Regions:
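Carbohydrate-active catalytic/glycan-binding domains of CAZyme proteins
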Residues: 20-337
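Bacterial Sec-dependent N-terminal signal peptides
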Residues: 1-22
Length: 337
């Protein structure tokens, strides 16, 4: 009887622990934040029926974790894009430190059968790194070192041309082999910010839908909350028009939900993944619907709010959590470390 009670108690605690670590409610719904962990600057892409999510690790290495999911709710780490940054001794705690700096805001794309990732250290050596792989669960290879582009978004157009969209509406065309900038290629500012955009405006993510170009950015006007804005144009060089697509607090906190990206599922439904700054907890991602209204990707529910509880986009997937218990009884550390 004692043994049975002990086993029952263990199973109960295990289930409760898993529930606490996962946003999956077990009834076909999930609760936002979809990941209760520090996963800043999310970029999410879909390849077939698989979703991939890359985030920021700053000074921690290996860096730029790649996560995989079948339902956008249950995620697992499958690889890291890079092992170390070696161009400055500060990344090895020599001649100073890089705490709070390092790798920021990776852009993840799938193009012609390969995955590409671009990131810049928010510190020396002020370069940009392009990594690539055919298998996101395997090893990523350094493809090229190109200029530093702040909070950049890779963009591959249908005509084969490649671009980097970065900063506050800047764009630079790249060589077709992604080894540097294309001399004589497109190099311009896509728009001038209006008077309402009087503070932070960054976190570029560009997509193309139905022949239109959409540039999503985080905006943080003075005296306001973080919000997401969208610039759209019929030509990549513009002219662009702007619309606020998400501006709402969440969870009783005064800060808004913004900076991330939008994507579709195999059935053509659209979603957004954007973070909210939770202070010491970090920047936690929230999953929400994205509804196209008059050619604009409007985020949140019908009232423009981030839903607290939402139906999972895909049903029937195994519940998983990024945070795990580890007995350290294997030869290699788990990817969570």
């Amino acid at each position: 009887m004692k043994r049975f009670f002990t086993l029952a108690l263990f199973l109960t605690l295990y289930v409760l622990s898993l529930k606490a670590q996962s946003s999956d409610n077990g009834d076909g719904t999930f609760t936002n934040p979809v990941i209760w962990a520090d996963c800043p600057d999310p970029d999410v892409i879909r390849v077939g029926e698989d979703f991939y999510f890359v985030s920021t690790t700053m000074h921690l290495m290996p860096g730029a974790p790649v996560m995989h999911s079948k339902d956008l709710v249950n995620w697992e780490i499958v690889s890291y894009i890079f092992d170390r940054i070696e161009e400055t001794p500060r990344y090895s705690l020599q001649e100073g430190t890089v705490y709070g700096r390092g790798q920021w805001a990776t852009s993840l794309r799938y193009h012609n059968g390969r995955f590409y990732a671009y990131f810049t250290p928010n510190d020396q050596p002020y370069k940009g790194y392009v990594y690539t792989t055919e298998d996101p669960r395997g090893k990523w290879e350094l493809h090229s070192v190109i200029p530093h582009f702040h909070d950049a978004s890779f963009f591959f157009d249908e005509d084969g041309r490649a671009y980097m969209v970065y900063g506050t509406g800047m764009i630079r065309e790249l060589k077709p082999d992604l080894t540097g900038v294309l001399e004589g290629g497109l190099d311009t500012k896509l728009f001038e910010r209006d008077k309402e955009e009087n503070n932070l405006l960054e976190g570029s993510r560009m997509i193309k839908k139905d022949g239109r170009y959409y540039l999503l950015m985080i905006s943080w006007p003075r005296g306001g909350i973080r919000r997401e804005v969208c610039y759209r144009a019929d030509r990549i060089e513009g002219p662009y028009e702007k619309k606020v697509i998400l501006e709402t607090p969440f969870g009783g906190l005064g800060d808004g939900v913004a900076q991330g990206t939008i994507f579709d599922d195999p059935q053509g439904n659209w979603y957004g993944m954007f973070f909210q700054d939770r202070g010491g907890v970090g920047r936690v991602p929230h999953l929400m619907p994205c509804t196209w209204i008059d050619g604009w990707p409007m985020l949140g529910d019908k009232d423009g709010k981030v839903p607290e509880i939402m139906e999972k986009p895909v049903q029937g997937q195994e519940r998983k959590a990024l945070t795990v218990s580890d007995e350290f009884d294997t030869e290699a550390l788990g990817l969570c470390w």
